[in-house]
Amino acid sequence: LARNACILICCNETHVLGWYVCRYEHSKAWEVLLRRISPPTVVVSDGGTGFQKALKKVWLKAKLQRCLFYAFQQVKRYTTIRPKTIAGCELYGIARDLLTIHTQDHAVKWVQNVMSWKVRHRVFLSEMTVDENGTIRPKHERLIKAENSLVKLINNRCLFTYLDTSLRCTCPATNNRIEGGINAQLRAMLRNHRGMSIERRIKAVFW
């Protein structure tokens, strides 16, 4: 709801399980919402601010699957869809490949590709520059941030939970269920009623 409020939503395959209104997304708000819901076996998240911290505190045994589409989008935000460097083009392609992984072997190969990319371009990534304030900083800072976003997810072991054969349930690789279903309908409704006050918009979402 723009900068005025945020509505956190949890759902399963068929129903909305709960929602919580807050000023902005943060771990305490997620904690309040998660405590209202029975702990699941696995949860899919877009990686919103504070969610993983709340998950570790409230749903101790639940496994986390990070939405692969959001992981790719995070890299794309830094590299753009038309990277201007060879390293950028390669990393964009590696991130895009996330959306095509269907086996453990493919996942292992993908992680190896990320690490190989890092080694292959280590000299390029170590280049420094001086900004307008005279501060020395990495010349390819955005590319490094893109790489770090993937490495962090690899280290957190939350990219390929959907391939875990020990799970007794089906785990999707993305959160399309809530984004393409619930959130898309809510955004469409709010676009069609832009003149409503923030209070009425919140009530409309709840309705």
Question: Which role does the model predict for each range below?
Answer:
Residues 42, 46-49, 53-95:
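Conserved beta-strand -> loop -> alpha-helix junction used to position metal-binding or nucleic-acid-contacting
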